[in-house]
Amino acid sequence: MKYKKKIAIIMLMVNIVVTLYLLLLSYYNRLSNDDWTFWNALSEKGIWGFIGETYLTWQGRFSGFFLTSLDLLVYQCLGNLILPTLVLILAGTYANYLLLKFYFPNINKKLLIVISNFLFYISILGLLDFTTFYWVCASGYIKFVVLSEFLFYFVIKKSSNIVDYILIILLSLLIGGSAETFTPIILLLIFVRVCYCYFKSYAIFIECKKELLALCVVFIGFLFMVFAPGNAVRLSSFEHDFSFSGLLLCLTKAFAQYFIYQLPKIFYATLALFPGIFVGQTLGESSTLGFMKNISVKKVISISSLILFIVIILAVLPGSIAVYALLPLRSLSFLSFVLVAHFFFIGIFLGINNYKLTYYVPLCFIVFFLILGYRFYKEIPNCQPYVNSLSKREFKLQILNEQILYRGVSDTLVYIQPLPDFKYKDLNCIYLDYMESLIYPNREKKINFKYFPFLYDELSSDKNNFRNISYKKRLNLKFDIAIVSK
């Protein structure tokens, strides 16, 4: 009992500290880069006009653009992004809670809330690209994971009403148009669930009606996304090699790259072992689950790891086909949640078989709090100067704009100074620097990996860059702008 109580207290402490950390950062978060392009389109055309234009000319992820529009409207009303961040935290915690409560109904509800919040937080901290959580255009990758959890809950819950079916349709449609890397994984999971229900009910399809409904709607949304005219426009800018050897080589490289980026972040996912052990020990005390003690833990780890490997391959495969490379790390954000689920599942079986990992608990969480404390120390003090720099730049440009309007000058190019560099070297950056030196020892110009929790709202030295044009349009400037080249 002391062991379980210790884990519960530590998880609660983690939740409090991480909540403070995430909300403090959200207070300083601002729109950046593509956000302003979308902001301008949304202001001119409205939500549906914006989605229609991007669908026809850029990309088919209609539901992703819909969620982005909602966040931009909130920012337009409130002037900050605290509310979307808070809603995402609450939704992610509640989605975890619903699923855990369904599978583990005998565990105390308050403890399930603590565990649910903890699992969501370590999934966020373990993101391959943490800026995904705060970048409006990219945060949809996380939101769709949460929406998928809600979808699975409404599909698997025993009793259903008309509201549940409506929610299944809406959630399925949103997930169908989420991302080419993510939707196929959801389709596969729903299909597995359909097969399970089919054989469990002795081939009576009526027992699988919710699963079949979700499968059909997600698939329709997926087709609508994949065959969008805008996809052809975007893909035309990439080179492709559809030969088997070319795809295999690209897939191998993409998987190796993913592994390199994932390795330093896997620590956060391993923390899911401890709430898993907590749940497993509680289940082990139930006589009805005594048979699970006879299942080999090594066998469970092997099977779960094999499934994890297959999911990772399926995740990097679309990028290998579409752009012949590993997609941006933000598009693989859902793998952070998959890794947490993997270790949580293993932890349950460790707990059932009375593995406590007693000595690892304090060590792991001491390391965790040291890492988080360092992030607090390096990031929070720099957030205010970062925001001040953005405001100062904008204020100067607006003053200059008024002067140019007064003088009647046109076709002017104004050079502005780049933002101060508030990025810093964390352990992940040091690791990536080392890996680059091993893989590319003769590269003359090496990548200088540096980190900041937000995507920098930096412009280009080219006045025709889309970011410069969007920034100019947002401020209604009467002159072109460009960054002074370093």
Q: Residue spans of the language-model regions?
A:
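Membrane-interface micro-motifs in multi-pass membrane enzymes
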Residues: 34, 111-156, 179, 313-348
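Transmembrane catalytic cores of multi-pass membrane glycosyltransferases
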Residues: 23-86, 135, 173, 180-331
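Membrane-interface helix-boundary motifs at transmembrane edges
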Residues: 2-3, 100-111, 158-163, 198-209, ...
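Intrinsically disordered, polar/acidic, low-complexity terminal segments
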Residues: 4-58, 68, 72-112, 207, ...
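Transmembrane alpha-helical segments
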Residues: 91-103, 147-159, 174, 187-195, ...
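Alpha-helical transmembrane segments
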Residues: 6-21, 113-120, 169-170, 213-220, ...
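Short hydrophobic alpha-helices at membrane interfaces in multi-pass membrane enzymes
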Residues: 154-174, 212-213
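Signature aromatic-anchored transmembrane alpha helix within multi-pass, membrane-resident enzymes
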Residues: 164-166, 215, 294-305, 350-376
